[in-house]
């Protein structure tokens, strides 16, 4: 189910962090650099490595749109880069100038949080690059940070072992002693926990120097307010756990440890699914890709390993039309794995009984889903069609040569006036306004309720599209 498909060995010192966008992988290191790779063939981009920091780089992360990359360093700065060109967009200096240990974007790309060794946490406006709010924890370094999927709050973890929950106005909502010897990482699952009416509940994982991974339920209620509740502990590591990350469907949690191993935990009936032992020194970071089951793990052995869980064999050689090649040649089993990845496990039996392979999948319509496959649930049919449309959209954009991130997910056309919705995705303004005016208050991409109907102009993406158009005009 999981296999090593590629190893990156370009850094000259410990790998400290890795992060995915839909099309790229970013890695950073104590060697002061950030490197960018294409997910199509894992080739390093022409403008990589990115160089600005004067000391070790501790963390890197993409904005939800994938157009901006943030990196932070011992030099006391957080740098924002264009992921399309490698150009520096701005340099944010941490209040007090302390080494910055962690950074993360809010789901709507509106804010960037940066946490430092002096315990300060800065919340920046990611559009204007101005400091919005600042807070701090006492007697500890901030080493971990994660926003809730709805963007309503974020959690920080400290070297003292405390999980602290903040709202978007930097008010401290709660502080919990989570790991006796210090926290090293925390991560939210993108999938909400089931709850009653009026409840918003999300799963949070934290790990630490106590060799443990703990799962928490973070719940926001209209009546009782906020609650952080301990759920369970995942075991398996025999040394401090340095990193943890949920898969995009929330069904797996990866963890990396001083014991040099990576463990893939199942969520639900908790179990160890896989133990990966390829690294020869401490595993410092792990990250899942947002839309495919790829996992990257980084280590003090200066390497980043790429692991694949399902579907296609990586294309070797030319990648002119990889998605179309892979999808059309999917076997029936590949389609079954894809269904599970989309959260459509209940349809696996129906698809297998009707021998749906990749080619048949691409030709399914609402009529065939209802008439031929006898899928009675309108919600299930709609979710299948949306997922298939995403595959077709990516194929269309690849075949036309237009970068996928420039294509509106609703119209499947090149965006002219891109805006960021509250689900973190970018859309053509007119298409998204029409979507909302039809009283569709759910995300076109995730089908989850939109936390807000506010649309924020994506100026960075618009500039990138205009530059691309200029270079492709004949």
Swiss-Prot record:
Domain SAM: 330-394
Protein name, as recorded: WD repeat, SAM and U-box domain-containing protein 1
Residue intervals of the U-box domain: 401-474
Family matches, as InterPro entries: G-protein_beta_WD-40_rep, SAM, SAM/pointed_sf, Ubox_domain, WD-SAM-U-box, WD40/YVTN_repeat-like_dom_sf, WD40_repeat_CS, WD40_repeat_dom_sf
PROSITE patterns cross-referenced by the UniProt entry: SAM_DOMAIN (PS50105), U_BOX (PS51698), WD_REPEATS_1 (PS00678), WD_REPEATS_2 (PS50082), WD_REPEATS_REGION (PS50294)
Positions carrying Phosphothreonine: 456
SUPFAM superfamilies: RING/U-box, SAM/Pointed domain, WD40 repeat-like
Annotated GO biological process: protein ubiquitination
Record's keyword terms, sorted: Phosphoprotein, Repeat, WD repeat
Annotated organism of origin: Mus musculus (Mouse)
Record field: transmembrane: none
An annotated Gene Ontology molecular function: ubiquitin-protein transferase activity
Any Pfam family hit: U-box
Keyword Nucleus: no
WD repeat ranges, renumbered to this chain: 10-47, 52-91, 95-134, 137-176, 178-227, 236-275, 278-317
